[in-house]
Amino acid sequence: MKIKLEVSAARCEALERELTALGIDIDDDAPLVLRERNAYPDILTVRDAATNERVRLPVCDIITAEAFGHDVEVFTSSGRYLALSRLYQLQAELDPERFLRISNSVIVARAHIQRISPALSMKFTLTLSDKRRVDVTRSFYYTFKEYMGI
């Protein structure tokens, strides 16, 4: 049997030893997932957009995740990656204190917001650390204001 572990770093090594001793293989591609309640991963498995190879991406490097149709692209300062899941699934995996959905198609990392500019008709335009601009749509306007404390 193969499982994927999504637990805190403090528990990961001990759990991995115990499960391996029981004959259970730990694999990032396993169909079953053992997840710690209220624990968010430090690393996501994604595909490199250029080579299509699987890459373990540190969550702290993520600037945005954007949905384009059925594809979800994850942007970092070092490049562009393709998520292995839908945007709503990715949102559930990310820490809500560090990431916020700002439209139906964009999740943004709070730490990478450099400038917040008000726009017409209950919108904000965000300038990110990679100099890209993204819009907070009207549907997410009040959630964003509360989250950012403005």
Walk through the language-model features, giving the residues of each.
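Basic, polyanion-interacting recognition surfaces, primarily
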Residues: 1-150
